[in-house]
Curated annotation (Swiss-Prot):
This is Protein translocase subunit SecA. SMART domains: SecA_DEAD (SM00957), SecA_PP_bind (SM00958). It is found in: Cell inner membrane; Cytoplasm. It is a peripheral membrane protein. It comes from Borreliella burgdorferi (strain ZS7). It is an enzyme of class 7 (translocase). Its EC number is 7.4.2.8. Keywords: ATP-binding, Cell inner membrane, Cell membrane, Cytoplasm, Membrane, Metal-binding, Nucleotide-binding, Protein transport, Translocase, Translocation, Transport, Zinc. GO terms for molecular function: ATP binding; metal ion binding; protein-exporting ATPase activity. PROSITE patterns: SECA, SECA_MOTOR_DEAD. The gene is secA. Zn(2+) binds at residues 884, 886, 895-896. One of its GO terms (biological process) is intracellular protein transmembrane transport. GO terms for cellular component: cell envelope Sec protein transport complex; cytosol; plasma membrane.
Amino acid sequence: MLKAVLETTIGSKSKRDLKDYLPTLRNINKLERWALLLADEDFSKETEKLKDELKSGNSLENILERAFTLSREAARRRLKERPYDVQIIAGLALHKGKIIEMKTGEGKTLSSVQAAYLNSLTGDGVIIVTVNDYLAERDSNWMKPVFDLLGVSVGVVLSNMDYELRKAQYAKDITYVTNNELGFDYLRDNMRYDLNEKSLRKFNYCIIDEIDSILIDEARTPLIISGPTEGNTNAYLEVNSLVSFLKECSKDPKTGDYPLEIDDLDGDYTVDEKAKRISFTAKGLNNLEQLLVSKGIISGSMYTDSNFNYVHYMTQALKAHLLFLKNREYIVGDSGVEIVDEFTGRVLTGRRYSDGLHQAIEAKEGVRVANENKTMATITFQNLFRMFDKISGMTGTADTEAKEFHKIYNLDVVVVPTNRLLARIDEDDTIYYTEEFKFNAITDEVYKTYKKGQPVLVGTVSIEKSEILSAMFKSRGIKHEVLNAKNHSREAFIIAEAGAKHAVTIATNMAGRGTDIKLGGNIEHRVRKKIGTNVSLEEFQEAVKNERENYLKDYNEVKSLGGLYVIGSERHESRRIDNQLRGRSGRQGDPGRSRFYVSLEDDLMRLFAGDNLRSLMGKLGMATGEPITHSLLTKSLINAQKRVEDRNFEIRKHLLEYDDVITKQRDFIYAQRNSILKDTAIKDRILVALEEYLSFLLEGTKSSTVSNVFLNEVNSIFAYMLESLGSIENISYLDLKAKLMQIAKANLDEKENLIGRDLFNGFLRYEYLKNIDFKFQEHLANLDSLREAVYLRSYANKNPITEYKEEGFSIFSELIKDIKVSTIRRVLQLKLDSNSSDFKSTKKSRNVKPIHKELSGIVINENKSASNVQVVRSSPKIGRNEPCYCGSGKKYKNCHGKS
């Protein structure tokens, strides 16, 4: 209430920010005459002057107005587009580290030019992040002529580039890159064995396009570099055949809930659709054990070490059959099971569900079941972007998530007014009891609109629903296009014609993000269809000029019909996604209309608002087949969405608390790696570490004589070198420590003299880094297991986060000690000769793959041609071909794995 009163009297924070930018905008407009008089060659000279001023101690704020004026004029000359005042305001907000909300078609891409140019003048680089390679390449090519005129360099990083090319692109003043590539490059850089192979430089300033998609929708999705491991894929096939033998517990037919008393549960498992969770009952576990034994899958108890994983396999199999449906969560394509993004409807190429869920779905669908993978490095987008000195972002829909942006990222949202008043009519939702009545009503509405000639865009939440509507449209003779994950290759063509007369388009949550739907169709696309692509730029421009009259005629005709009519076939969990769909209509002051059709059988209604709405509709006297439109019902729908959004926000905040623990530890490990990469005297580092460890072993020792415990530890490190130690009878700890240090120094000096200082330093660096990487990978697996373990402690009234932090710190302390000791052991015990290959090849190739994992279960494989991968979430297991844990350098199967 107080917030509403304050906004009424003094305006919202967003409005106050806009008001603050007006004096600067007026000054920029006054300077425009100065920029108009400049010759083209003067722009780069002015850029150099501004750079010199910054080097002399001037601030960005003092040169801001001239920089914005220069970049505005450069855009006018090279793009024939003069940024509107609202675009200049958007640029000012971006420079100030804000998130700008600009409606579709208002020119977000051009708005970023001024802020990017100004911040590039420091020489520390600007990164502009987009959601895919197409947009990164398109935007960099589109804006390059502007930046070229200004004398600043522009680069673009694409997924198929090697590290040398990436390094060159990141070195440019302004670099366009996707969020995935940026994250993977950060992780890869921190797995390098040579400083010169790092591609990134300092994280200075970042502008994130579609920031809500990256920092909200993708927030639960850590990036992961993974490597191969051995797994039991046959188990998923075995348990898949058992699904039909188990029965779900009965629910109360009135409430749809399970009995509260455990003894009243009559089945083998319960299903939680909201949390996507399967829980076995005691009876279910007994039945599962009997099934596994009777089918010959296991022998003996299910609760032994070798058999207990079958509970996990069976849980994932049930999830695959009951909670993850074909043509909704995934499709089966040429490359097997492919995940569909719930927010965009696009196929997430290369991504895989984690925890064995993807294997369970593959077994269910009868396709090849791929092996599992282990985590080698990981980071979330939340913590990746928080490393920048300054970040800002732009999107068409951010205001609904303003609270989360502020609380987690300390970013404020500025809603930039449209250049022209919005003419779209947003109607109240129309609500039906059943999905069948709703789809019939949508078909009737589309048929009526189609006959009139007005273009229609119908948004669906799944491929399955889009195909149902498509079949109904066909039966009514409605010509239409379907845009979903199955035919995404035709997206550009379909979107280009979606605003033409008589056009009807069914789209699955993907109404052309990054692409405008223009009334009357797309003139450039129309010309390309006529004259082809093998023509010169001059011929193309002439053809566009000749086609313009016909295009304007079509545009005005569609405009007179009411513009684009957007129909939502269902409310999404997030209001942002609904607003994105609405935003396809009413571009740049064009007329438009939008309406959502909802039924009580929709997922959102059924899970979060069904009972309340059903009661309200009954009170309003609604019959089963009748529609109802009422502001109370619309408000109830929005409240349901808010509840889901709040729940998802809490989940993301909770995940961030866990990830912050890993972040601090990762930062420490990466700092150690960087220090070692730069170190030219690693021998001294190892000797210091040895002395510290020996001192640690001596701490708290009261006896004056050497204990067996101390000797055993020393023996594990020095091994054969102890022959030169001589008698230790009656020797003190301090004297023994001094002798051991002499032996260690002599050992390392001898090896250094044998192969040379530089080569030996390189060898030590490689061994140290290899050990850090191997141990840290084990540590990540341990943290994963710890996280699952502490969750159960909430039942004992313990805070899982606190438990995770405390135990995480404890095992991290052990990790640091273990890294040092195992490295010392390895370099001391290894025998070198001048022909040894151990030090001649210190850059062994490692089979690693970047993947992208959602904590609720998604992974991504960046290498599209590589075999599918998965992240393991269990106790760490050493593969037969991995290096042995003892540090000998041998494979595990040839060392301690023999026994």
